[in-house]
Amino acid sequence: MREVLGGKGANLAEMNLIGVPVPPGFTITTDTCNEYYEVGEEKIKELLQDEVMAAVAHTEALMNSKFGSVENPLLVSVRSGARASMPGMMDTILNLGLNDEVAEGMVKKTGNPHFVYDSYRRFVQMYGDVVMGLKPVNKEDIDPFEAIIEKVKEEQGVTLDKDLSVESLKKLVELFKAAIKEQTGQDFPTNPIDQLWGAICAVFRSWMNERAILYRKMEGIPDEWGTAVSVMAMVFGNMGETSATGVCFSRDAGNGENLFNGEYLINAQGEDVVAGIRTPQQITKIGSQRWAERAGISEEERVAKYPSMEEAMPELYKELDALQDKLEHHYHDMQDMEFTVQEGKLWFLQTRNGKRTGTAMVKIAMDLLHEGMIDEKTAILRCEPQKLDELLHPVFDKLALSKAKVITQGL
């Protein structure tokens, strides 16, 4: 299944089969990616047209909404999914299907203009970056969209994106569209069907971007494997204080400790957790307490300003904890998961076998063996020879670290 649907598509299908809540959607196969490079963009659109539109109609029926409708719109995300995990190498587009008319319709439907225009400005930014080529190649280069956001925040006198007013968010949408026109000479597409095809083809193109090619060389992944494209109905973590988004691991990827851990943000979308725009909060209480201790934050301040999900959303935390345990037992390995909470309902967007350090690799393999989840042969095969080198290098003693004087710290 992974060979055809890619890792992400296969895991979404599998999660659905075992009763884990995933949003409805469809996956375009890895073979299509290779065909894209053989026959070109226009021919691929022609070949896929009927199947993609039928799959969109099926998703519409399941979500009871319509793609491109003003009264009851369906928005989708478009994500890449190679056979082997390639974290952060390829591109994702969220909130696809928005235009000025759909945004106005969504405001009437939800009564939440801040959420709608926050989603809209994110979409224009992602689409401009990924599909229309405005994403900076190097980290040192200035992202034109981020420069615009900083200017608007300064004008409004706020420091966080989430504190921007509805008027400022509307202004961002217009400024982003103007930046796209100025830099590419093309207008931002307003037809949702055109947006969808642009995103699908951009994911296929991202298989051959510089980062992805370099990563494949390092990991020994063949070019001909191609990437699948997963199109999924949007669920929103930025609909208010009962919505959230996060990433989590069934065990500690750093040291292998059998401790569920991760980070989440209330009233945010997926990219925010890893983008460094806001400080994410810990999922478990123990993780939150450890983080606060390292950061020199008192327990009172931690509880008031940075509560864990276990404390802030106890019922959802229980559900998340039970499902992550279910997934680890299903895959017999440590899982790296992404989730969204939309108005109190939990959805899983992804699971994969988590990347880990050499120390964690050995500990997790031995723990899973002792827990009866894997056999000895599997435990040995889980230990990558090149990572064993990490175990031969000196590391800090935890006790010594706790007594050390902190000179400075990063994110």
Residue spans for each PLM region:
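Long, structured protein-protein interaction/assembly regions in large complexes
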Residues: 409-411
